[in-house]
């Protein structure tokens, strides 16, 4: 795996209220349980994280998925695509972008 192979997907989700955010977070944690994460790892997902954006007047979450390569991304999308069926109803606006990694601090950190 070279750094140019690593593929990343980033989504910014905006919620109109704490209630909608809490609803989403509970379902997100249920959907991405240990078994789901094991499946995704087995199919090439390196990591997944969700962070709440600070210092904003609105409620926003940034979700970052990292994959070994584009093929891994495509394999994992079969699972991620089920979110709409399982996630249920909540009000939010999402926008995202995807692409190949061009730089990482891991180039400067030696493995222990």
Q: What residues fall within each predicted segment?
A:
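Short, flexible turn/loop "capping" segments at secondary-structure junctions
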Residues: 2-7, 54-58
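Short amphipathic
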Residues: 12, 104-107
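An amphipathic, aromatic/His-enriched active-site/gating alpha helix that lines ligand/cofactor pockets
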Residues: 30-47, 56-57, 64-103, 110
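Active-site-flanking beta-strand signature of metal-NTP-handling nucleotidyl enzymes
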Residues: 6-15, 62-64
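Short, surface-exposed ligand-recognition loops at beta-strand->loop->(often short) alpha-helix junctions
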Residues: 15-28
């Amino acid at each position: 795996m070279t750094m140019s192979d690593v593929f990343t997907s980033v989504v910014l989700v905006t919620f109109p209220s704490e209630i909608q955010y809490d609803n989403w977070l509970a379902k997100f944690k249920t959907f991405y349980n240990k078994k789901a994460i094991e499946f995704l790892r087995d199919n090439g997902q390196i990591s997944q994280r969700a962070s709440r954006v600070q210092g904003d007047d609105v409620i926003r979450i940034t979700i970052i998925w990292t994959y070994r390569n584009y093929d891994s991304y495509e394999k994992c999308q079969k699972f991620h695509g089920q979110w709409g069926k399982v996630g249920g109803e909540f009000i939010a606006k999402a926008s995202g972008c995807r692409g190949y990694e061009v730089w990482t601090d891991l180039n400067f950190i030696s493995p222990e």
